[in-house]
């Protein structure tokens, strides 16, 4: 095992890890922070105290549990609204929403997950609780499959061998050979789809956005409800639409 770099500030590393451990949790106790991060209670207490005093965590005086503050959320929005990709994408997402009347998302990769960073939804929409910032495994969403379709064969094989295929719904694809076939199909068609694989009743299609240098940056994702949309109809109508949207955003980066 390599020695940590002399440039690494281990206390800062612990603090950032503790902040990341709030993903998926409304609040955490010191014991939970320690367990989530493999650190002692004393270390968790020092980190939590520092984050509280700097305004990134709030400590409930009654329960003694900690939760993230708006200041912490603001870091994410600073990233979001300073990136040219996101500045250019919103108008395109809005146009696509007007054309199809459905939810349109922008997602970017983070390891083996996709993070939803922007959304335009119709006024009638009553959403599942899937706020901007939510991470979804690449294998369970069209956005991730569209991006994985661009991976070199060896890297795709490695990821598929190592991926954890949880059964989120009765329709989630967990068979590696079937996943590979769906990704191959996405490579051929230039868009991917996922049919009720993370949420029951949700069908989504996605196409990749590219930067100036040709590198993939993320994906446009259109999410529609079943049974109002069948897979055949979504592929026929939304496949070409999501490809056009991704190309429009790519040209402006």
Describe every region a protein language model picked out.
Residues 88-96, 160-207, 252:
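Short, basic/aromatic recognition patches
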Residues 209-212:
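Sensor-regulatory modules in signal-transduction proteins
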Residues 2, 200, 217-253:
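Juxtadomain coupling helices with adjacent low-complexity linkers
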Residues 63, 67-163:
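Amphipathic alpha-helical effector-binding/dimerization core
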Residues 55, 207, 220:
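Conserved GNAT-family N-acetyltransferase fold
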Residues 1-87, 94, 247, 251-252:
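N-terminal helix-turn-helix
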Residues 23, 144, 148, 152, ...:
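Short amphipathic alpha-helical signal-transduction/dimerization elements
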């Amino acid at each position: 095992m390599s020695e940590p770099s002399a440039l690494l500030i281990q206390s800062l590393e612990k603090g950032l890890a503790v902040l990341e451990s709030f993903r998926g949790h409304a609040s955490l106790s010191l014991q939970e922070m320690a367990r989530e991060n493999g650190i002692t209670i004393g270390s968790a207490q020092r980190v939590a105290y520092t984050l509280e005093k700097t305004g990134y965590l709030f400590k409930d005086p009654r329960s003694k549990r900690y939760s993230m503050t708006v200041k912490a959320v603001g870091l994410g929005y600073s990233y979001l609204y300073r990136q040219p990709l996101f500045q250019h994408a919103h108008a395109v997402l809005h146009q696509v929403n007007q054309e199809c009347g459905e939810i349109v998302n922008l997602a970017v990769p983070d390891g083996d997950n996709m993070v939803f960073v922007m959304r335009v939804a119709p006024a009638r929409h009553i959403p599942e609780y899937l706020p901007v910032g939510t991470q979804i495994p690449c294998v369970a969403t069209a956005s991730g499959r569209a991006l994985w379709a661009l991976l070199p064969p060896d890297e795709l094989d490695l990821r598929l061998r190592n991926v954890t295929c949880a059964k989120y719904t009765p329709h989630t694809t967990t068979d590696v050979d079937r996943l590979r076939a769906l990704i191959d199909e996405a490579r051929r068609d230039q868009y991917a789809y996922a049919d009720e694989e993370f949420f029951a009743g949700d069908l989504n299609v996605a196409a990749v956005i590219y930067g100036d240098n040709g590198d993939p940056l993320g994906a446009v994702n259109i999410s529609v409800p079943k049974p109002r949309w069948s897979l055949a109809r979504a592929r026929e109508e939304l496949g070409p639409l999501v490809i056009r949207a991704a190309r429009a955003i790519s040209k402006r980066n």
